[in-house]
């Protein structure tokens, strides 16, 4: 995928897993309705909305920082790959809708409240933010969401996250692109 997209696609990304499943002709693909992250799935179970935060989405499929949505050129390329593998869905049909910080990501439904609290004390209606992973949380916690800011994480792995002022000029396989909760790379 990195070669087809001219953009580094780490093997851990959702789209890389889907691509490998297609290359391996895995049987479950015939009934595949959609793909999501754990955070996105839990959010859908609580709100009924299949949405995901832009930072979380950037670990599923490349994001265009100008639009804050999946990169249209790469979506078109992956649609061609899906067709080559006789998949019935398009990229956009498979992926959750992207939301930026502050976007309407739904409310806690009665069913969602019951999942969290079967006793009925928790009531539906709470506003829900777009689900994000730990990268976005770290960026916000360290106020590293503006251009030319960054942070270093030293936990299970050690890495730096830097908010760029412009797109990279070429593919660097050692750099994994992520997106801030506001949609910047």
Regions flagged by a language model, labelled:
Residues 2-132:
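Gly/Ser/Thr-rich active-site cleft segment
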Residues 114-121, 126-185:
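Catalytic phosphate/nucleotide-handling subdomain of diverse soluble enzymes
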């Amino acid at each position: 995928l990195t070669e087809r997209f001219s953009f580094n696609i780490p093997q851990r990304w959702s789209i890389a897993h889907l691509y490998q499943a297609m290359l391996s002709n895995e049987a479950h693909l015939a009934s595949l309705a959609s793909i999501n992250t754990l955070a996105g799935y839990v959010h859908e179970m609580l709100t009924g909305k299949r949405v995901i935060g832009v930072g979380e989405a950037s670990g599923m499929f490349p994001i265009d920082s100008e639009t804050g949505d999946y990169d249209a050129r790469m979506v078109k390329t992956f649609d061609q790959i899906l067709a080559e593998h006789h998949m019935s869905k398009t990229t956009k049909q498979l992926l959750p809708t992207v939301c930026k910080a502050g976007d309407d990501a739904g409310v806690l439904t009665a069913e969602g409240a019951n999942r969290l609290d079967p006793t009925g004390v928790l009531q539906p209606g709470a506003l829900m933010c777009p689900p994000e992973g730990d990268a976005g949380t770290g960026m916000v916690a360290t106020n590293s969401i503006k251009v030319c800011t960054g942070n270093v994480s030293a936990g299970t792995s050690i890495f730096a996250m830097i908010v760029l002022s412009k797109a990279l000029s070429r593919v660097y396989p050692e750099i994994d692109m992520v997106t801030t909760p506001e949609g910047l790379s």
